Regions:
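Terminal amphipathic helices with adjacent charged low-complexity linkers/tails
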Residues: 193-219, 396-424
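Conserved mixed alpha/beta core segments that line enzyme active sites in large multi-domain catalysts
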Residues: 48-79, 258, 264-333
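Mobile "lid/hinge" segments at catalytic clefts and subdomain interfaces of large enzymes
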Residues: 118-132, 139-145, 158, 313-413, ...
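Glycine/proline-enriched, intrinsically flexible loops and inter-domain linkers
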Residues: 24, 64, 193, 197-297, ...
Length: 802
């Protein structure tokens, strides 16, 4: 918010406070000043001058030679081509750039000649002085800026136009809507510099009459409009605002329009209370109804845009139609026009969340909506509407009808919190007396009654003792709070068991050449189709996002697989020949009610370790990564079993991961149809493992065995079996049949192709045999091998390969 420092002087003493000091102290007290700048910084050596004579240029049909009194001994001669400078302009006061003057944009003005006639400066238009439309009388918008006849001659133009002022640009946080006003910042300024602060109650004389004979107000949704205040002004005179008001509005970054609109903007800046003015004749039966909009209703707002309304929005209506979107913008059907004679001033308080939802839905963020969203004090509405009427009388812009319509359903009670000086000292690390704390709080409008802090209505952000303590710290000075070393006992942090397991799993993946990926928890329902899930699959039931970023982010995922395949596809599309990724992501399983996700119950969250790879690993190498993961986590009792029902995977190259017979995951080759939907070719591998189940299966005890004293004997075996026989089942048979001498068995080759009959495959294992107390003989090894081969032949019809 931009604020000219001179405006603060209406409410507090600013004498002796430099802009630099103001910037530093207000920022340290919590009201951050982004920038402080001088309004007239780019203007130098420009004064007011009175036109004494205007004659035609002898060698030009449009130039005029002027003599001007600029407060010096001799008049200054200036040649101008401005269309509004004529012999009739004699006596007018205007801005004059003297020799070696400067204008905004770095323009330098020096003496010169125009068509052979000396010109010792330049007469200025409002654009050349950096002013905007609305800051000057309409008659001066095309040509030289003429000033009021009472303007002194030879005066610095910066003082005349209100540019001899400093402006602070504040960054107001969302919890301090009271500081989005001159009065609010004046209160902060007075408290920070320990100066007096006062706000006069607006005084309205009125001209008689009774407002109730002109209009009525009905608030149907009091929860969305706690207070609605209105006054009527008749015999309105629409004209430019006085210079002092235009200058203040311009300094705050607001473009002046006319006196009535400017008054509403002025009061909003001064009090922080948005206002609106309706043309009374446009209100059917002089009636205002504050209600929810109806589906199908529409309104054209003051910016000329048509909007469709819904029943989630609050509207200001008359008997027939909406005339404003509450808290956002007025309607064009009740706009103040040049022929307006009677005006209704509205000053109301609207529910912040409703205004925010409405403004977002309509794509209309305004100065008013930005204030209402943060939560305003309902008690401001009365003072604001009276201040507007006071300004109307002060400017002679109309006649105020007696009476006020004030529909007040707001809570009349102050918020009260326990006053706990000792706790606040302990929290802040200070030793302030109770009297000191009370004094600091009272400067900000707080009161202490019966050991309670009475929170002022305008401080909607104060809810707890720590909030009150913060106010004490701000006024005491953050820079005065002594720095102290931490006095508590230092406790070494550690990872939780689940964090340790996740880090260990991630390490195994990285060591296996996998890169970590991270994806959104929001996906599109169409992704379930892409991974081949059946229409009746219960996993399709997902928690829906009410306000999604888009259709692709409309539900909470119940699987990470679509995100993994999408990331693999992204790499493949960018011609990356290989990619191996892992993600420790969360899935969200909803509570199902009547076949849908129950919106009143939060979904169950579960961590899933998902792996994906193409172009680098074979099926069995990928399986080896899973085995390494189980081994690193010290999980025993793990096994694998064929999985044919999972439609996302190839039915002949997919396995369930079991721990003590309970399924905790799946891995295998992605179904070619699914892979093709993602633009992937070749063998694409994936795995999905439940981290909670892995964590529960971790054996906390690790057993260490001494190094063997005797060597192992290694034997290889290759057999021919049907293609459908699972390698894991064969390995389990070998482990059981080979006896106690078997130390380990490892699958090292699976071959199908030349030399192998159709429907068959060659499977080769390496067996390691060892005895703890002796070196094994060939006979002992052969016996174990024969037992293993015999078991394979019996159970699977295996044929030993030569």
């Amino acid at each position: 918010m931009k604020l000219p420092l001179s405006w603060l002087s209406d409410y507090t003493d600013m004498n002796g406070i430099t802009p630099k000091e103001y910037d530093a102290k207000l920022t340290m007290s919590g009201s951050k000043v982004e920038e402080v700048y001088y309004l007239g910084a780019e203007i130098d050596n420009v004064v007011t001058g009175k036109i004494l004579e205007v004659v035609d240029h002898p060698d030009s049909d449009h130039l005029k030679i002027c003599q001007l009194d600029v407060g010096k001994e001799e008049p200054v001669q200036i040649v101008t081509g401005a269309p509004n400078v004529t012999p009739a302009s004699v006596g007018e006061i205007c801005p004059v750039c003297l020799h070696k003057s400067t204008l905004p944009g770095g323009v330098k003005i020096t003496k010169g000649k125009l068509r052979g006639v000396p010109s010792n400066g330049m007469m200025c238009s409002f654009q050349e002085l950096g002013l905007s439309h609305g800051c000057v009388p309409y008659a001066c918008e095309n040509g030289i800026l003429f000033l009021p006849a009472s303007t002194p001659v030879g005066e610095d133009i910066k003082k005349v136009l209100g540019l001899d002022d400093w402006v602070s640009d504040f960054e107001i946080t969302s919890n301090r809507p009271d500081c989005l006003s001159v009065i609010g910042l004046a209160r902060e300024t007075a408290a920070t510099f320990d100066r007096p602060f006062s706000v006069k109650t607006p005084e309205v004389k009125g001209v008689g009459g009774d407002i109730n004979e002109y209009m009525s107000v009905e608030v149907k949704d009091t929860d969305l409009c706690p207070r609605y205040t209105a006054r009527i002004v008749k015999n309105i005179k629409i004209e430019p605002s006085p210079a002092w008001m235009r200058e203040r509005l311009h300094a705050c970054g607001v473009r002046p329009i006319n006196n009535i609109v400017d008054i509403t903007n002025y009061v909003m800046l001064e009090y922080g209370q948005p206002m609106h003015a309706f043309d009374y004749k446009c209100l059917s039966d002089g009636r205002i109804v504050v209600r929810r909009a109806r589906n199908g209703e529409s309104i054209q707002t003051l910016d000329g845009v048509d909007h469709d309304l819904s029943d989630k929005m609050l509207a200001i209506c008359d008997n027939d139609k909406p005339v404003a979107v509450a808290g956002v913008m007025g309607g064009a059907n009740s706009e103040i026009m040049d022929d307006t004679k009677t005006v209704v001033f509205e000053s109301a308080n609207f529910h912040g969340a409703t205004v925010r939802i409405t403004a977002k839905a309509l794509g209309m963020r305004t100065e008013a909506s930005g204030r209402f969203e943060k939560g305003l004090d309902p008690r401001m509405t009365l003072d604001a509407v009276n201040r507007a009427c006071e300004l109307v009388e002060q400017l002679g812009a109309g006649e105020v009808i007696d009476g006020i319509i004030d529909v007040d359903n707001s809570d009349p009670n102050h918020k009260r919190l326990p006053f706990e000086p000792d706790k606040m000292n302990a929290l802040l690390g200070l030793e302030l007396s109770t009297e000191e704390q009370v004094k600091l709080l009272e400067k900000l409008g707080f009161k202490i009654e019966n050991n309670e802090v009475v929170v002022p209505f305008f401080r909607t952000d104060i809810n707890r003792m720590c909030d009150v303590a913060e106010e004490v710290a701000r006024m005491y000075g953050y820079d005065k709070i002594p720095t102290t070393l931490y006095a508590g006992e230092m406790v070494q942090g550690e990872f939780t068991p689940s964090q340790q397991a996740e880090r260990a799993a991630a390490l195994v993946c990285r060591e296996a050449g996998f890169d970590e990926s991270m994806s959104h928890s929001f996906i599109s329902p169409k992704f379930y189709d892409m991974i081949g899930w059946d229409e009746n699959d219960p996993r399709r039931i997902s928690t829906t996002i009410l306000n999604p970023l888009g259709e692709d982010f409309s539900v909470m995922r119940t699987t990470v697989l679509p995100s993994m395949l999408d990331n693999l596809a992204h790499n493949h599309a960018h011609r990356n020949p290989t990619a191996s990724l892992y993600e420790l992501g969360t899935i969200y399983t909803p509570t199902v009610k009547d076949g849908k996700a129950d919106p009143d119950v939060l979904p169950h969250e579960e961590k899933i370790l998902t792996l994906g790879s193409y172009g680098r690993l074979s099926f069995f190498q990928f399986k080896g990564v899973i085995e390494a993961l189980l081994r690193e986590l010290n999980i025993k009792g793990a096994s694998f079993a064929p999985e044919k029902a999972n439609l996302s995977y190839h039915p002949g190259r997919c396995a369930k991961v079991l721990i003590d017979g309970k399924e905790i995951g799946v891995f295998g080759t992605i179904h070619p149809t699914v892979a093709a939907r993602y633009g992937l070719s070749g063998e694409v591998l994936a795995a999905e493992l439940q981290m909670d189940a892995l964590l529960a299966a971790i054996d906390p005890e690790k057993l260490y065995h001494p190094l063997p004293k005797f060597p192992a004997s290694t034997r290889d075996i290759a057999v021919l079996v049907d293609d459908a026989v699972p390698a894991a089942s064969m390995q389990a048979t070998v482990e059981k049949a080979a006896g106690k001498l078997l130390e380990s068995v490892k699958l090292f080759d699976v071959y199908k192709g030349k030399g192998i009959p159709e429907g068959k495959k060659s499977v080769a294992y390496s067996l390691s045999l060892r005895a703890p107390d002796r070196t094994l003989t060939d006979e002992e090894c052969d016996k174990a091998m024969r037992a293993a081969i015999s078991a394979l032949e019996t159970e699977f019809g295996a044929q030993l390969r030569g």
